[in-house]
A protein has these predicted regions:
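C-terminal alpha-helical "lid/dimerization" subdomain adjacent to the S-adenosyl-L-methionine
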Residues: 155-210
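Class I SAM-dependent methyltransferase SAM/SAH-binding core
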Residues: 53, 59-109
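A short glycine-rich, Lys/Arg-flanked "PGG" loop and its adjoining helix->strand segment in the class I
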Residues: 134-146
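Conserved alpha-helix/loop element of class I SAM-dependent methyltransferases that forms part
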Residues: 30-48
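A short SAM/SAH-binding and catalytic strip from SAM-dependent methyltransferases
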Residues: 117-132
Length: 233
């Protein structure tokens, strides 16, 4: 289905952010390494020549992880930040996998309309506003082959749950590792509630089902980062 451009959070992924993105996130390497390890496992039984859609591909981390493990796979990566794509293209070229990749500037609507064995979207969905989240998931669903896989990780949590204050303190510790300022830490609650489109796990799973996926299966959690996988029904 054709959807209007999603309402996203303000674009902070400029050239300065793109150049510093991987360095800034290196403090979270244990989390990202585990996430990518599990990503490779949950997609391990795809065809040897699988075609993978990477939504919000950024600097190409998931392509680098999957391309090394599965040398017959090809990738289409889409991202609204030209600066992030430029960094990603350079990394993929250095890793000698760029010839297996097509990188597109834009949103999921700008990706080829069908034929993917799997779609991957890591730490992207929470940048999509609540009112556009179903359309986002539906666009991904419609680009998969019947039975195709969707794997996603996003910031997710019930912000009104009694345990949320404790969850927030843990999340602040993550932000400190990434260089957060005292001012940004003080605003973190508001950022999660208003600047980002953070949904509860139950809301996310319900939207996946509404988009046409089978039952979402949780496969990853690190504080407020949660990952699910499901198949197109």
């Amino acid at each position: 289905m054709q959807q209007s451009r999603p309402a996203t959070t303000p674009n902070v992924f400029n050239r300065e952010m793109a150049d510093a993105y991987d360095r800034r996130n290196s403090a979270l390497a244990p989390i990202s390494d585990c996430l990518h390890f599990l990503l490779r496992l949950v997609l391990a039984d795809l065809p040897a020549s699988a075609r993978i859609l990477c939504v919000g591909v950024g600097t190409g981390a998931e392509i680098l992880s999957l391309a090394k493990a599965y040398p017959g796979w090809s990738f289409v990566g889409v991202d609204p930040s030209e600066d992030m794509l430029a960094v990603g293209r350079s990394r993929l070229e250095q890793a000698d996998v760029l010839e297996r990749c097509q990188l597109l500037h834009g949103y999921v609507q700008d990706a080829p309309s069908e034929g993917f064995d799997a779609a991957v979207s890591l730490l992207v969905a929470h940048f999509i506003k609540r009112e556009d989240r179903l359309a986002f998931y539906s666009e991904i669903h419609d680009r998969l082959k019947p039975g195709g896989r969707f794997v996603s990780a996003e910031i997710s949590g019930d912000l009104d749950a009694p345990e949320f204050p404790d969850m927030l303190e843990d999340w602040k510790r993550i932000q400190v590792l990434m260089g957060a300022t005292p001012e940004s830490l003080n605003k973190l609650d508001s950022t999660l509630r208003h600047a980002l489109g953070v949904l509860s796990p139950a809301e996310t799973e319900a939207l996946w089902r509404s988009a046409g996926f089978g039952k979402p299966i949780p496969f990853f959690q690190a504080f407020m980062i949660r990952g699910w996988r499901a198949s197109r029904t």
